[in-house]
């Protein structure tokens, strides 16, 4: 079995709260130790129309949690008649992770969404939860934070948030060998969830 730190290598995820919504961004490289084993892995997952999570860590563990969270969100909506709040989803994830801390899911998560306003939470591997205006996770997080700390501003537009998130990921790509290949950016506003990648993302950055 790979050492825990080795399994957690790879990826950089970023989240920002903007005036009109939340921006999540991630690279698409997946690594196993020092080996690149996939170049087009999706690391941001839609949970509901106004909820998403970005995961850095073991791909299988993250996908297992995504399936569980989607099922819980669907059950909540069918029972209560409305979408789960961002805080409720983050708290549910934190409780699941804390309950399995002796046999942990190997991942660090950013939970973003829009209910009454845009919100972003960071949830660590054992269920520690923090709400903030911006956050990063993964092997390139130090490089991403160097950009976010200096350039993030409150009330920035979603378009500016996309540009800043991409800049933070690109700095990580240049400096962290476990971050690379493609980019996926997600925005969540009152109008819902939208993905940007490839040519569409390039157009947004002009």
Swiss-Prot record:
Name the UniProt record assigns to this protein: Proteasome subunit beta 2
Signal peptide: none
One of the record's GO cellular component terms: proteasome core complex, beta-subunit complex
EC number(s) reported in the record: 3.4.25.1
Native organism: Pyrococcus furiosus (strain ATCC 43587 / DSM 3638 / JCM 8422 / Vc1)
A GO term for molecular function: threonine-type endopeptidase activity
Function: Component of the proteasome core, a large protease complex with broad specificity involved in protein degradation.
Alphabetical UniProt keywords: Autocatalytic cleavage, Cytoplasm, Hydrolase, Protease, Proteasome, Threonine protease, Zymogen
Gene name of the encoded protein: psmB2
Subcellular location, record wording: Cytoplasm
Propeptide: 1-10
Pfam assignment, any one: Proteasome
Complex and partners: The 20S proteasome core is composed of 14 alpha and 14 beta subunits that assemble into four stacked heptameric rings, resulting in a barrel-shaped structure. The two inner rings, each composed of seven catalytic beta subunits, are sandwiched by two outer rings, each composed of seven alpha subunits. The catalytic chamber with the active sites is on the inside of the barrel. Has a gated structure, the ends of the cylinder being occluded by the N-termini of the alpha-subunits. Is capped at one or both ends by the proteasome regulatory ATPase, PAN.
